[in-house]
């Protein structure tokens, strides 16, 4: 019995195959040496068959693996060949695209060549045409120049002939007349526009005035008349002062002193220079002399004060008065448009404009100084001398606020009273104390002697602009006894719209202050109980209370020219007058049971 065989491969490295070859060799040796029996041979043959089959399987796997390796190499070769073919195809496509572009460029170049040829031909034709046109223009220019020269010669001859023609002179005269007429027409048109604006303004004013009551219109007319009457003398005095200042300035200019500035504005420098020339002790002596002469001239001044409505202040050479001249003139011209503002407007105006009523002693003092010497300038504080620029700003501010309307009654009730001469006395800081004591004694004696005689009210509520220093001086020198209470007004009001109707007297039995222009609508005199009412003896006493005792009317129709006094007698004194607009209908005075006391109403609506 033979065993299976197995082919030996060269360079065998598989351990199973090597063991199989070794086992076959040993099995063959055993059989050859008869060292194994039959059963052992059969079992060994089965084992060798199985082992040989496994080795053959290994051989088959190795062959399959070798074939797969060969196929992989072939695949790699195919891949490389495919990649090479792709690259070759792309290169071929790129070459084809480049060849196509080259062909297009050739076509474009050929087309450009043809276009350049056409342009060259067109340029040649254009140059030929341009040369032809240039020759034509040159010929035309020559012809035009020749024709122009001929026309110039002909025009010169025509103008020469026209200059000698009369029609040309007539035409020029007509053109001049036409120009003058156009200017006249333009002026008339402007005048027409101005008149139309004036008409519209007056219509609006008349429409507004037509809504007012007759009584209010009469009151305003009288107020405006009195304001005009009081401002005109001041305007005249200001003009005279201005002329005096101009004359003095001309004299100083001739003498080589200070003069007006280049802008012809009234500067304070020439006035201040004149003040500096005099010694301050000499000023004090002159003021003492002028004030001590009041006793001798008091009767004459009293008669002068009684014969006029108000006494104007002396034209002191204060630069502020020079600046106030256009303000006063403007107020006088525009007085017809003054409207009585409300209380809030008056409170806004009060810090800017101060109404300074004049007392009896200040009136006498001013008259004495006017009779003694009117050319002595009032001394100025050193702050004004050192700050002319601030004073010029004050002048401009005063001019800006001058055209504001104000109600004399409201301002008279709200603003504290102060005399401008007393302010001047406060400014005389360098006057010796002995002179001050002498002046105070003389003024006290003079006021006690002349108080029963001088009954004139303040001089038309002089409107003067004062700075902060003067306002402070006024508050320091104000007399506490003259502050108005609820049932008493100032005793020297020349222009008082006393709507309260209460005038403060010296005692309960005396009458109220005698106002030259007192709209005393209720006519209640001094005293809170209203029992002793002197009433008003003003020029326009609308309710006919002319100063008699116990509030009785005198029946004097001259003091009530408008006939407003329908109720001459206030029962029990001090009651509501007829011109009271008392819509609640009580109509009872202060002493009756229904009124409940003295009437202190304004217009009792």
UniProtKB/Swiss-Prot annotation:
Consequence the record notes for mutating residue 269 to D? Phosphomimetic mutant. Less dynamic state of syp-3 at the synaptonemal complex during pachytene, decreased DNA double-strand break formation, increased germ cell apoptosis and reduced brood size
Query: Got any disulfides in this one, which pairs?
Result: none
In this chain, where does the modification Phosphoserine occur?
269
Instruction: Spell out the Gly residues composition-biased ranges.
Output: 524-537, 588-597
Name where it mostly resides: nucleus
Q: Where in the cell?
A: Chromosome
| One GO BP | reciprocal meiotic recombination
Keyword vocabulary terms for this entry: Chromosome, Coiled coil, Meiosis, Phosphoprotein
Ranges for region Disordered = 288-319, 357-430, 479-605
Q: Does the keyword Transcription apply?
A: no
Q: Where is the composition biased (Basic and acidic residues)?
A: 395-404
The coiled-coil regions, if any, are: 115-201
Q: Where is the composition biased (Low complexity)?
A: 487-505
Q: Where is the composition biased (Acidic residues)?
A: 384-394, 409-430
According to its UniProt entry, the function of this protein is described as: Constitutes an element of the transverse filaments of the synaptonemal complex (SC), formed between homologous chromosomes during meiotic prophase I, and is required for the assembly of the central region of the SC. Required for chromosome synapsis and chiasma formation between homologous chromosomes during meiosis, mechanisms that are crucial for crossover formation and meiotic recombination.
Which protein is depicted?
A: Synaptonemal complex protein 4
Tell me the name of the encoding gene. syp-4
């Amino acid at each position: 019995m033979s065993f299976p065989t197995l082919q030996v491969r060269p360079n065998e490295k598989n351990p199973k195959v090597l063991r199989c070859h070794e086992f076959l060799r040993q099995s063959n040796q055993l059989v050859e040496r008869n060292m194994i029996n039959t059963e052992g041979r059969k079992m060994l043959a089965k084992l060798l068959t199985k082992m040989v089959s496994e080795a053959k399987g290994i051989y088959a796997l190795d062959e399959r693996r070798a074939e797969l390796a060969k196929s992989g190499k072939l695949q790699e070769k195919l891949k490389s060949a495919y990649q090479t073919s792709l690259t070759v195809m792309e290169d071929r496509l790129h070459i084809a695209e480049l060849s196509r572009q080259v062909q297009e460029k050739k076509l474009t170049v050929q087309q450009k060549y043809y276009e350049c040829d056409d342009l060259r031909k067109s340029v040649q034709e254009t140059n030929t045409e341009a040369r032809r046109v240039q020759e034509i223009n040159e010929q035309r220019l020559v012809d035009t120049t020749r024709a122009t020269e001929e026309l110039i010669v002909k025009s010169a001859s025509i103008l020469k002939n026209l200059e000698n023609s009369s029609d040309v002179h007539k035409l020029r005269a007509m053109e001049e007349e036409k120009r003058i007429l156009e200017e006249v027409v333009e002026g008339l048109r402007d005048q027409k526009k101005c008149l139309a604006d004036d008409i519209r303004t007056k219509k609006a004013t008349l429409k507004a005035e037509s809504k007012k009551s007759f009584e209010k219109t009469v009151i305003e007319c009288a107020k405006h008349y009195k304001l005009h009457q009081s401002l005109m003398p001041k305007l005249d005095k200001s003009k005279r002062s201005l002329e005096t200042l101009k004359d003095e300035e001309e004299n100083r200019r001739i003498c080589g002193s200070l003069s007006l500035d280049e802008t012809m504005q009234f500067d304070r420098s020439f006035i201040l220079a004149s003040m500096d020339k005099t010694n301050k002790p000499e000023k004090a002596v002159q003021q003492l002399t002028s004030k001590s002469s009041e006793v001798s001239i008091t009767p004459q001044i009293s008669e002068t004060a009684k014969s006029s409505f108000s006494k104007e202040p002396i034209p002191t050479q204060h630069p502020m008065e020079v600046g106030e001249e256009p303000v006063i003139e403007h107020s006088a011209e525009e007085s017809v448009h003054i409207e009585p503002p409300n209380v809030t407007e008056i409170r806004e105006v009060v810090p800017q404009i101060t109404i300074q009523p004049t007392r009896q002693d200040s009136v006498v003092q001013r008259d004495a100084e006017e009779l003694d010497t009117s050319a002595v300038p009032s001394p100025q504080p050193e702050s004004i001398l050192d700050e002319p620029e601030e004073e010029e700003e004050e002048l401009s501010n005063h001019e800006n606020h001058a055209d504001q309307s104000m109600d004399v009654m409201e301002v008279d009730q709200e603003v504290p009273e102060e005399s401008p001469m007393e302010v001047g006395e406060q400014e005389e800081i360098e006057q010796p104390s002995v002179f001050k004591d002498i002046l105070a004694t003389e003024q006290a004696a003079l006021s006690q002697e002349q108080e029963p005689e001088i009954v004139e009210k303040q001089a038309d509520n002089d409107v003067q602009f004062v700075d902060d220093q003067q306002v402070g001086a006024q508050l320091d020198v104000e007399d506490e006894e003259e502050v108005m209470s609820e049932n008493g007004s100032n005793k020297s009001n020349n222009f008082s719209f006393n709507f309260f109707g209460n005038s403060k007297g010296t005692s309960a039995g005396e009458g109220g202050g005698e106002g030259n222009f007192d709209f005393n609508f209720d006519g209640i005199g001094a005293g809170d109980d209203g029992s002793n009412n002197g009433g008003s003896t003003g020029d326009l006493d609308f309710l006919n209370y002319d100063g008699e005792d116990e509030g009785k009317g005198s029946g004097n129709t001259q003091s009530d020219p408008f006939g407003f006094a329908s109720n001459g007698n206030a029962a029990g004194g001090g009651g509501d007058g007829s011109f009271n607009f008392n819509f609640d209908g009580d109509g009872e005075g202060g002493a009756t049971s229904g009124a409940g006391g003295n009437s202190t109403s304004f217009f009792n609506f």
